[in-house]
Amino acid sequence: MQTISTLSQLSINSDSRVLVFMPHPDDEAVFCSGFLKKLTSNNIPVKLITLTSGEKSTLVFSLEPGDDLAATRRIEQKNSCEILGITDYEILSIPDGGLKLKETEVKEIITRQINIFKPTHVISLEPDGIYGHPDHIGLSKFVSEVVTSPINLLYVTIPEFEKKRPVSKMSEKSVINPIIPEFCLELKNTETEAKIASLRAHRTQFGLFDTSSQNFGFFKATKLLNSEYFTYR
């Protein structure tokens, strides 16, 4: 794995256009918000497509009685994008937990967004969906099948350390094997600060303790607080 600190080391430059597909609100914050902040800080066009509203999440920190989780998570995503400097984004309404059952619709969305935005690079989760979530796996599969040369497909992944951790209860697999990263992208302090703020914007998904400066246990354990991980297809 090569440790890098600049976009040029990922073959992304001022002529690049980066289109990002994520399954749920907060996936961008967890896995690539530092990278996204690096893109916008360098004035590289970026568009974020979130396929679902995340309405099936079992995490409801700070959700007031009577509040609609999907609507709340859409607002959280908007706030996260503002923090990251992303002005071009869409939050779609593919059913949370049912993305794999919508292959034709999702592939049409991916194709349409590629035709509209004309990216040089497409970003999505690696084929095992990081931790086996069926929506993650489905989106990665559909993106991988639609994206063809000359567009570059860059997978977000995790360091090998994480593979030894227990599989999430949301996983549809008993064993997961995320792609080994080619690149460890080190984040500047300002990018880490933006990542923390982006995570905190998703208030229903991350309790204050989870994102307190004294804790961040998950992100320290997965080495995702100060670095993010990528592999080209």
Identify the meaning behind each predicted range.
Residues Q2-L19, L101-R233:
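Metal-dependent de-N-acetylase/amidase catalytic core
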